[in-house]
Amino acid sequence: MALAASASAGPTDQYAPIDRPGPRLSVPAADLRASVKCTPSAYHSRREVALLVPGTGVGPIEAYAWNWLAALDKADYPHCAVTLPGNSVGDVQESAEYVVHAIRHTYRISRSKIAVIGASQGGVSPRFALRFWPDTRAMVADYVGLAAVNHGSSQNDIAYPDGNGPAFALQLKRTSKFIEAMNSGKETFPGISYTSLSTSHDQFVTPEGTTDLSGPASRVANISLQSICPADSSDHIGIGTSDAVAYALAMNALTHAGPADPEAVSTSVCDQTLMPGVDPSTYESDLAAFIKTSTANITKARVLPAEPTLKPYVFASR
């Protein structure tokens, strides 16, 4: 069963109107072009191409090669993936520009609306892109967030009460200006089906419900893994890398009109230990490598005294 959507975010008057054209991308064009890789089947695809966006501390290979990309390859499902700057430990506003380009590129080569899938911070940068570059909304059919930090996390508020942290962590506080701006005006937009998945065992994105998005049930589904499989033990990392229920819900969203429908997912998925694409014989080492890489990159992230300043285009008066 889908959970009730959270209330819409607050202040809107200081932020850009939701339909004001977005700014020109500031990232060099060559860097943007190099950041997106697609399968041959993504070109002129008859199916909804999946664009995968990695989370904090990792690139698409570390995040998805051993799970999602392998599963989509096995199913012969068209997909693209975007590499974000600095392994996503810097300013999320910069990452969002890469996502804007990736959406436009994937839409252009596929010649039809696409799906965006992101885990943790990888579910946030696409929403920032959709909010401040409104042309991208007509290019996206589905958004799937895997424990996306949609309203910030109290863990970050506790860890960085006075700043002095990595840019992304300060921006993903529940009290951040970044989160307020991203959720201003509207959290979700007509024409896009939103599926936001969460787990009650999330150790990083808290409190429970902070992943939820507001909007009509016809196009917004907020779903806890435990509402389908009560014994599902996946945590924040598991929901984005190996959980079979999350994969089943995401693929349901991509292959049917509207957001994921929990009623359409067989409860037999609860008996699956790992999602398709994950090799049981290498799962432990693959997971360990993912955690090691992410932890190392986060540890090396530059510490800032305060949240990065919001860009001028974010505001009504710029």
What are these regions (language model features)?
Residues 61-64, 155-158, 207:
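Short, solvent-exposed loop/turn and secondary-structure capping segments
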Residues 54, 93-188:
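Serine-dependent carboxylesterase/thioesterase catalytic core
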